[in-house]
């Protein structure tokens, strides 16, 4: 087990989270695994409340997501620092998360609750055309549904799962115990007296390479209504935090922030575009461009986007504005324990601290940004009609 301790006096709380990492290729039945994990996490929450009191478990959370090339399952809690609540025993709670005890089975009620919760999350993802289209593009580009909608889960598969599958959860427990485990602790903690503490945290790498390029997939939900297009650009090798900052600034200048170069470009071309936004997907290393337009214009959009990216230019004033927006965005992220804890993986991916990341923004020049955008490559688009 690896323990990542991030000492900070920034918060009056301590956050503790246990994570389980599994290569995507070995996730044979992700729906069943996620249902069990959701049910087990609800059980763990009750165990923690019974052992340490309501304050220790009231902010308990759990999730299952994509983490670069791995499936990440996390459960954790946030509690008041012992300085302000002497009844909380942090050392004992850390050891509880280090040695999690999973339920040997799930009751019918626990199964139903976990399955319905997962179905609701999937439904929200599928009904959001922007999120869904981006996921479909990723799975087409990388040739694996687990990089896209497969990570959400398959609704028909989930509905077909019988509660008897969880009367004996031995195989789920064995699977979780065999995975790479991390214990992440954030707060004013002097030391971590946990068995198996790794003095050096492992590096986070992401070497995924697109297997399909020039993708153009379409799905029709309705013959009426607008189309949502998601175009993807492969950002190549991200060598360090400096490259990460550059692509974040490009993202901001192109479409994420108010002075959108793409929206200006479409307005000048007299195309009926209702919505334009960009997003850098760090897990898939893709710059995504999402556009909502009339169905009759969807063929005109990709060449216009490529034209705008190839002709991209920025000046010092625009870049400084984007830098300030990015600083504010990161400061807001780092201003909550959950936000900072969620960002720890990104910081480890680029081997930097949050202070170094913020300081590195100032060093980027217009020339750096223009040189970097010239290296990204268009890989295709996905369209959802109606």
UniProtKB/Swiss-Prot annotation:
The keyword Magnesium does not apply. Transmembrane segments: none annotated. Induction: Transcription is highly induced by oxygen limitation and is under dual and independent control of Spo0A-AbrB and ResDE. One of its GO terms (molecular function) is metal ion binding. Keywords: Antibiotic biosynthesis, Bacteriocin biosynthesis. Gene3D superfamilies: Metalloenzyme, LuxS/M16 peptidase-like. The keyword Chaperone does not apply. GO terms for biological process: bacteriocin biosynthetic process. Involved in the production of the bacteriocin subtilosin. This is Antilisterial bacteriocin subtilosin biosynthesis protein AlbE. It comes from Bacillus subtilis (strain 168).
């Amino acid at each position: 087990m690896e323990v990542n301790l991030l000492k900070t006096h920034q918060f009056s709380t301590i956050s503790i989270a246990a994570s389980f990492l599994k290569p995507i290729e070995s996730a044979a039945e992700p729906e069943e695994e996620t249902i069990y994990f959701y049910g087990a996490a609800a059980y763990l929450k009750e165990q923690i409340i019974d052992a340490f009191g309501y304050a220790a478990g009231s902010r308990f959370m759990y999730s299952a997501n994509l983490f670069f090339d791995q499936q990440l399952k996390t459960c954790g809690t946030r509690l008041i620092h012992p300085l302000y609540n002497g009844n909380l025993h942090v050392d004992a709670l850390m050891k509880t998360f280090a040695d999690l005890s999973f339920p040997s089975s799930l009751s019918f009620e626990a199964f139903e609750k976990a399955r319905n919760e997962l179905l609701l999350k999937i439904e929200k993802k599928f009904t959001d055309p922007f999120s869904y289209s981006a996921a479909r593009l990723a799975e087409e580009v990388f040739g694996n549904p687990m990089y896209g909608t497969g990570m959400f889960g398959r609704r028909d598969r989930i509905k077909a799962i019988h509660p008897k599958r969880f009367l004996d959860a031995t195989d789920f427990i064995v699977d979780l115990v065999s995975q790479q485990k991390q214990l992440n602790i954030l707060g004013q903690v002097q030391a971590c007296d946990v068995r198996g503490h790794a003095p050096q945290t492992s590096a986070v790498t992401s070497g995924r390479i697109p297997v399909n390029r020039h993708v153009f997939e379409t799905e029709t939900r309705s013959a009426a209504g607008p189309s949502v297009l998601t175009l993807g650009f492969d950002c190549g090798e991200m060598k360090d935090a400096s490259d990460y900052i550059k692509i974040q600034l490009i993202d901001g200048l192109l479409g994420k922030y108010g002075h959108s170069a793409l929206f200006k470009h479409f307005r000048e071309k007299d195309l009926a575009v209702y919505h334009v936004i960009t997003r850098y997907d760090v897990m898939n290393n893709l710059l995504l461009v999402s556009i909502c337009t009339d169905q009759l214009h969807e063929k005109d959009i990709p060449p216009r986007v490529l034209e705008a990216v190839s002709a991209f230019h920025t000046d010092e004033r625009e870049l400084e504005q984007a830098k300030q927006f990015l600083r504010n965005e990161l400061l807001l992220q780092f201003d909550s324990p959950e936000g900072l804890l969620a960002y720890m993986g990104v910081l480890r991916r680029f081997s930097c601290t949050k202070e170094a990341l913020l300081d590195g923004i100032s060093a980027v020049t217009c020339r750096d940004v223009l040189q970097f955008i010239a290296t990204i490559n268009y890989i295709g688009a996905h369209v959802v009609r109606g």
